[in-house]
From Swiss-Prot:
<feature type="domain" description="HD">
    <location>
        <begin position="333"/>
        <end position="426"/>
    </location>
</feature>
<dbReference type="GO" id="GO:0006402">
    <property type="term" value="P:mRNA catabolic process"/>
</dbReference>
<dbReference type="InterPro" id="IPR006675">
    <property type="entry name" value="HDIG_dom"/>
</dbReference>
<dbReference type="InterPro" id="IPR022711">
    <property type="entry name" value="RNase_Y_N"/>
</dbReference>
<dbReference type="InterPro" id="IPR004088">
    <property type="entry name" value="KH_dom_type_1"/>
</dbReference>
<dbReference type="GO" id="GO:0003723">
    <property type="term" value="F:RNA binding"/>
</dbReference>
<dbReference type="Pfam" id="PF12072">
    <property type="entry name" value="RNase_Y_N"/>
</dbReference>
<feature type="domain" description="KH">
    <location>
        <begin position="207"/>
        <end position="292"/>
    </location>
</feature>
<keyword id="KW-0255">Endonuclease</keyword>
<keyword id="KW-0694">RNA-binding</keyword>
<dbReference type="Pfam" id="PF00013">
    <property type="entry name" value="KH_1"/>
</dbReference>
<keyword id="KW-0540">Nuclease</keyword>
<keyword id="KW-0812">Transmembrane</keyword>
<keyword id="KW-1003">Cell membrane</keyword>
<protein>
    <recommendedName>
        <fullName>Ribonuclease Y</fullName>
        <ecNumber>3.1.-.-</ecNumber>
    </recommendedName>
</protein>
<dbReference type="InterPro" id="IPR004087">
    <property type="entry name" value="KH_dom"/>
</dbReference>
<comment type="function">
    <text>Endoribonuclease that initiates mRNA decay.</text>
</comment>
Length: 517
């Protein structure tokens, strides 16, 4: 019984303890929940406050950025407005200037119109006076000579015709003199501009080359046993080796500069190598030929590069390089061709014609001289054949074939190439001429002028660039002097060969002498 009671008491105590525990747990849970709720509310308020502060800061920042953007846009708008105002002001000034120019032109036209009207009235008045004078003269003639109206008209017309012929001749002389003066002035300006823009070397090419030797013993080694070395070298190169008493030197003589250059290079290589025998000579000559061929190609390419000429056939480039080793009256032909191309190009640019055609024709105008010793014919005919073979432009071929006057020029470029060729050949120091040849040329020029009837004396001056002809005044009048000048110039062109141009001056002098006693 007691056990049951204890159990009941224990159960009751357990129930009461559980109830108390539940009540205590509930109280503790409620208190903790309240704490957490309060903490969460505090954090929420803090977050809200932070968000409000950040929103306020961002709002202020956005307002500030908006103000800055508005300021920037306003500044740009003001700058654009200022630029547009300035542009409008410039346009207004230009319009005002145009209006002023138009006003001035209108005033000029009005003045010209007034001048023309005045001149027209004056001309009408003079025509009327002339007609009145004619009528008066006709009446006077008829009265004095008792001529009929028809006879007086014929006499008057003859008189007017004579006066008109005299006036026409005078006018022709004045126009001719003015045209010549203007043409010569323009030509001098053009040639002077071209010449001063082209720097060219003076020429002093010879037909011999001197090779220096380290010592005179080398001469014997060059000659070789029984002369076999020198014979081999002469046979392979086609050059004459002159070994004389000149100390430490051997002279190479040949008409063909290419052969002379090959022999020079081969001999220099042999001297440097020291082994001189026929087999070695053949080897060195072959190397020298290849070296000269390469140099010829380089010279042709360099000439084209200097002038800015492109798409030239490789064979023509090679032939241009060969001109480096050709001379004409002592003038290097390649340098002469480059100079002619420069001069023709400059004059073509000044005249506004095709510069490319002028320069190309100037460079190629003497291309025939590269092979004229191998092919029969003049260098002009050979050059034309070469240019046609390698498909050069017809305008270039025409300008090239006209440079010696063999063909009548049909283009401005052809005239320019001929003029440039004459300028290059005639400039001081360009070409050498023996004294005997020079004197004969001047004597022939004077004899040609003396052959005309009425010529008293003639003098070739300015190194043959001018012929001054003194005529007999009783045989040659002023009109005949003008005609004689043209005839002498035409005969010089037909019978003489000369570089550049020759000025013909005819001088007629009349002297009246009387003595007072």
């Amino acid at each position: 019984m007691k056990a049951i009671l204890y159990v009941i008491v224990a159960v009751i105590a357990l129930i009461l303890g559980g109830a108390a525990g539940v009540a205590g747990g509930y109280y503790w849970f409620e208190r903790e929940s309240r704490k957490k709720l309060n903490s969460a509310e505090a954090r929420a308020r803090h977050i809200v406050d932070e968000a409000l502060r950040e929103a306020e800061a961002k709002k202020k920042e956005a307002i500030l950025e908006a103000k800055e953007e508005v300021h920037r846009l306003r500044t740009e708008a003001e700058r654009e407005l200022k630029e547009r105002r300035a542009e409008l002001q410039r346009l207004e000034r230009r319009v005002l200037q145009k209006e002023e120019q138009l006003d001035r032109k209108v005033e000029q036209l009005e003045r010209k119109e007034e001048t023309l009207s005045r001149k027209e009235r004056e001309l009408d008045r003079k025509n009327q006076q002339a007609q009145e004078l004619v009528n008066k003269q006709m009446a006077e003639l008829e009265r004095i000579s008792q001529l009929t109206m028809e006879e007086a008209r014929e006499l008057f017309l003859k008189q007017v015709e004579q006066e008109a012929r005299a006036d026409a001749a005078k006018l022709i002389r004045e126009i001719d003199a003015e045209a010549r003066e203007n043409a010569e002035k323009r030509a001098r300006e053009l040639v002077g501009l071209a010449v001063q823009r082209v720097a060219a070397d003076h020429s002093s090419e010879l037909t011999v080359t001197v090779v220096s030797l380290p010592n005179d013993e080398m001469k014997g080694r060059i000659i070789g046993r029984e002369g076999r070395n020198i014979r081999t070298l002469e046979t392979l190169t086609g050059v004459d080796l002159i070994i004389d008493d000149t100390p430490e030197a051997v002279v190479l003589s040949a008409f063909d500069p290419v052969r002379r250059e090959v022999a020079k290079i081969a001999l220099q290589k042999l001297i440097q190598d020291g082994r001189i025998h026929p087999a070695r000579i053949e080897e060195m000559v072959e190397k020298a030929q290849k070296e000269v061929e390469a140099r010829i190609r380089e010279e042709g390419d360099a000439a084209c590069f200097e002038l800015g000429i492109h798409n030239l056939h490789p064979e023509l480039v090679k032939l241009l390089g060969r001109l480096k080793f050709r001379t004409s009256y002592g003038q290097n032909v390649l340098k002469h061709s480059i100079e002619v191309a420069h001069l023709a190009g400059i004059m073509a640019a000044e005249l506004g014609v095709n510069v490319e055609v002028a320069k190309r024709a100037g460079l190629l105008h003497d291309i025939g001289k590269a092979v004229d010793h191998e092919i029969e014919g003049s260098h002009v005919a050979i050059g034309v054949s070469l240019l046609r073979r390698y498909k050069e432009h017809p305008d270039v071929i025409h300008a090239m074939e006209c440079h010696h006057g063999d063909v009548e020029p049909r283009s401005v470029e052809a005239h320019l190439v001929a003029a440039a060729d004459a300028i290059s050949a005639a400039r001081p120091g360009a070409r050498r001429e023996t004294l005997e040849t020079y004197i004969k040329r001047l004597e022939k020029l004077e004899a040609l002028a003396d052959s005309f009837d009425g010529v008293d004396k003639s003098y070739a001056i300015q190194a043959g660039r001018e012929i001054r002809v003194m005529v007999k005044p009783e045989k040659i009048d002023d009109y005949a002097a003008l005609k004689l000048t043209k005839e002498i110039a035409r005969k010089i062109e037909e019978e003489l060969e000369y570089p550049g141009q020759i000025r013909v001056v005819v001088v007629r002098e009349t002297r009246a002498v009387e003595y007072a006693r």
